[in-house]
């Protein structure tokens, strides 16, 4: 049972998160509502609004955009190399956006921050988005990208035995699903970094009830729309690789879950952490009070984002206990 809250929407946010929410609201106010324009135009607006968040941050010794072949056509990757040291460990990173929005451009700052802080080459995946490319295209591209990274590690100064998978929101869903496919094929990423991910289509949880609405950056109706575009209508039979909270999780590598408390998806992460532990998977559960969905993108002005990136990067380096 969900008890009524005596806290007004947004009052439980940290001050820097309120600033983040105001900034986003002001930026979107200069454009038509996304649901009033075509999807291509909505994507352009979302890219323009998010573009300032991707600016600044650490410089890389090298950034390279490449195209690789996959069963679904050419796939773009962005490779951020933080230093000239040989044989970096690596992180294949899948951006969020409900499988529908955003890109490696909107998440460029987050990826460079992780590269610099964790000492890993970070490879962003420009996967095909829904509804033009529905499930399982993006997941299959994620698997293909990880296999390409392992096969071409030496030429890009990476350690082929230390290539992690990660992502945020819908990208965390894809990262976890890709790890399950690789596990079943006898392959293994060396770690999983999952930032405020969506792992199930059940929106009856307490966090959906408590944090639904614009004050918290993501809502129930928005997530339902994302699921419909990703899976199609009518919904196909349940596939645990689309909703990996329902999958068998044993045999996965160590996993870090970054969880903002004020997020409709919070309970997805808490349930996943419990199931991973039951399956014997080492889990680091990093909870961030007062933070909202997508909070890591606010790194240019947010103490919560600084803490989130610092903690998860320390975990990737092996400096933090599970």
How would you label these PLM feature ranges?
Residues 1-79, 321-322:
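A glycine/proline-hinged amphipathic helix-loop "lid/cap" segment
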Residues 300-322:
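Catalytic active-site module of serine/aspartate enzymes centered on a nucleophile-bearing elbow/loop
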Residues 234-289:
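Serine-hydrolase catalytic core
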Residues 87-97:
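Short beta-strand element of the alpha/beta-hydrolase
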Residues 105-124:
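Short amphipathic alpha-helix adjacent to the substrate-entry channel of hydrolases
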Residues 180-235:
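Hydrolase active-site cap/lid region
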Residues 150-165:
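Gly/Ser-rich "nucleophile elbow"/oxyanion-hole loop immediately N-terminal to the catalytic nucleophile
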Residues 133-154:
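Alpha/beta-hydrolase active-site loop
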């Amino acid at each position: 049972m969900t008890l009524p809250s005596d806290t007004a929407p947004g009052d439980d946010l940290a001050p820097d998160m309120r600033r983040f929410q105001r900034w986003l609201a002001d930026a979107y106010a200069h454009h038509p509502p996304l649901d009033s324009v075509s999807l291509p135009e909505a994507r352009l607006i979302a890219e323009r609004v998010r573009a300032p968040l991707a600016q600044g941050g650490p410089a890389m010794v090298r950034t390279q955009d490449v195209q690789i072949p996959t069963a679904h056509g050419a796939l773009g990757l962005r490779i951020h190399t933080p230093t000239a040291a040989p044989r970096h460990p690596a992180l294949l990173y899948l951006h969020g956006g409900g499988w529908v929005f955003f890109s490696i451009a909107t998440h460029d700052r987050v990826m460079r921050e992780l590269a610099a802080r964790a000492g890993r080459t970070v490879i962003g995946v420009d996967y095909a988005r829904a509804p033009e490319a529905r499930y399982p295209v993006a997941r299959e591209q994620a698997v293909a990208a990880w296999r390409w990274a392992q096969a071409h590690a030496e030429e890009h100064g990476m350690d082929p035995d230390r290539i992690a998978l990660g992502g945020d929101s819908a990208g965390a869903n894809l990262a976890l699903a890709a790890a399950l496919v690789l596990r079943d094929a006898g392959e293994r990423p060396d770690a999983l970094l999952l930032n405020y991910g969506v792992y199930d289509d059940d929106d009856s949880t307490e966090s959906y009830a408590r944090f639904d609405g614009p004050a918290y950056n993501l809502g129930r109706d928005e997530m339902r729309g994302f699921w419909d575009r990703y899976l199609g209508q009518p919904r196909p039979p349940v596939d645990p690789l689309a909703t990996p909270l329902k999958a068998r999780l044993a045999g996965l590598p160590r996993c870090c879950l970054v969880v903002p408390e004020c997020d409709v998806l919070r309970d997805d992460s808490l349930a996943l952490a419990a199931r991973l532990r039951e399956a014997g998977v080492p889990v680091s559960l990093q909870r961030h009070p007062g933070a909202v969905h997508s909070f890591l993108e606010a790194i240019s002005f947010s103490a919560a984002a600084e803490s989130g990136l610092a903690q998860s990067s320390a975990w990737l380096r092996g400096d933090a206990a599970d």
